[in-house]
Each structure stands twice: as C-alpha cells, then as structure tokens.
C-alpha cells in the first residue's frame, strides 16, 4: 500500500503573487497610428529597480499625440540606456539602442529584446536580464520574420511585431555567487515560495520515496513513468534520457 508523502500531507493554499513594491507591468507603448506610420519621441526620466526582477526598468515619458498630457511608460531597460536619452518608437525610427521598431524594418543579424509575438501585445520574448533575440531572416511574401530566441530555438513572428534595439540590461547578474543563505532568502522572498527546498534523500521514508537508509541514497531508479500514482511521481518524470552527454560533436575547422 502506498504512503501519503509529505508534499501531499502538506497541501497548500492558492498561490498569491509577491507583488508588494512592484513597479507595474513592463510593456511597450500601445500600438497606435503614430507608430504604424511614423514615429513618436520619448525621453527616459529615470531607471529604477523592480523587486523580483533581474533587469532594471526605465520610465519613459511621451507626449500624448491625441490629448494634452504626458504618458509615462515602463520599458525594460536596454544596456547603455541613460536618463535624459531620447527614445523613438515607430516604423521610421532610427536603428539605435533603445529605439522601438517593427522587426521587419530591421536588417538581419540585428540584436533586439522585448520582442512581440503578435503585433500589439507589447512585448513577450527576450525580457530577462542580459537576454536578447537575433533577427535571422525576413520573408517578404508572407510578412513573417524568423528570429533566434535566447534558448537557441528559432521562432517565426509577424514582421509587424515590434522589438527594442539592444540587449536587456543587467547581464552577468548570475555570475556573482550568492554565497550566503541570507542572500538567497532575500532573493526568493520577493519572487515566489520556492526556497529552501529539501532533498528527497534527506527525508524519512514516510516523507518521500527517496528517503531513509543508513546513508543518503535513492536505492532505486529515479526515473518514473508518466502514469505513476500521486506520491510515487517524484524524481525524473517520464525522462527521455538521463545522465551526462557522452562524446563531443564533430567540429569542422
């Protein structure tokens, strides 16, 4: 008879996002007539930190083209952006760092960030610190553009989808080790409830299938079938492969 493991006994409430002191959604401008047919100019007011986010944010002020007021947008800051910088958004904007253009207007090989999946969704791809998207090629007949994502995967997006020229600021953030549990505590408390995480082999057998024994070891294969029962479904679930990659790919000089 199976045991009810600790994760099942623990249960848990509905997750509530840690949004205290967050600065709001980081998005491009709403797509309008000015961006579709020309460009609009904004100025970077300040660069700020957003709790729980690795990349800094930039507050960019635009004059509203239809009403007598100033609209302040929150952009994901690109590397090299500074306060007082002019940012141009639109089809006819120049190809300089920080400007927002449709991907179809940029040449192949351009490095961009915060790219839209669909025109007008205000940014979805390449948004974390140090990340960027590379334009691979354009298909004029279908109006599509092929881009390379930070993961290395290729994706096809509409040529009318917008992106910010340059890479996201804050690169190299993970190069500095945390070193202390206190730093990890403060890092994850503003993100989500995912730290600390106890290993299964450190538990008792009543708490986890990997627990127990006179020394810490699993004692059986860690791969489990997809159809495993709850409480048994721990470890490498329905793994296609396990272990280290053996051998090296042949490289032509």
From Swiss-Prot:
- Organism superkingdom: Eukaryota
UniProt KW keywords: Cytoplasm, Nucleus, Ribonucleoprotein, Ribosomal protein, RNA-binding, rRNA-binding
Main location per UniProt?
Answer: cytoplasm
Q: Which GO terms describe its molecular function?
A: RNA binding; rRNA binding; structural constituent of ribosome
InterPro entries attached to this UniProt entry: NA-bd_OB-fold, Rib_uL2_dom2, Ribosomal_uL2, Ribosomal_uL2_C, Ribosomal_uL2_CS, Ribosomal_uL2_dom3, Ribosomal_uL2_RNA-bd_dom, Translation_prot_SH3-like_sf
List the subcellular locations: Cytoplasm; Nucleus
- One Gene Ontology cellular component annotation? cytosolic large ribosomal subunit
Query: Could you confirm whether the keyword Methyltransferase appears in this record?
Result: no
Q: Which GO terms describe its biological process?
A: cytoplasmic translation
Q: What remark does the entry add?
A: There are 3 genes for uL2 in S.pombe.
Protein role: Component of the ribosome, a large ribonucleoprotein complex responsible for the synthesis of proteins in the cell. The small ribosomal subunit (SSU) binds messenger RNAs (mRNAs) and translates the encoded message by selecting cognate aminoacyl-transfer RNA (tRNA) molecules. The large subunit (LSU) contains the ribosomal catalytic site termed the peptidyl transferase center (PTC), which catalyzes the formation of peptide bonds, thereby polymerizing the amino acids delivered by tRNAs into a polypeptide chain.
Family, similarity comment: Belongs to the universal ribosomal protein uL2 family.
Assembly description? Component of the large ribosomal subunit (LSU). Mature yeast ribosomes consist of a small (40S) and a large (60S) subunit. The 40S small subunit contains 1 molecule of ribosomal RNA (18S rRNA) and at least 33 different proteins. The large 60S subunit contains 3 rRNA molecules (25S, 5.8S and 5S rRNA) and at least 46 different proteins.
* Protein name in UniProt: Large ribosomal subunit protein uL2C
Q: Which organism is it from?
A: Schizosaccharomyces pombe (strain 972 / ATCC 24843) (Fission yeast)
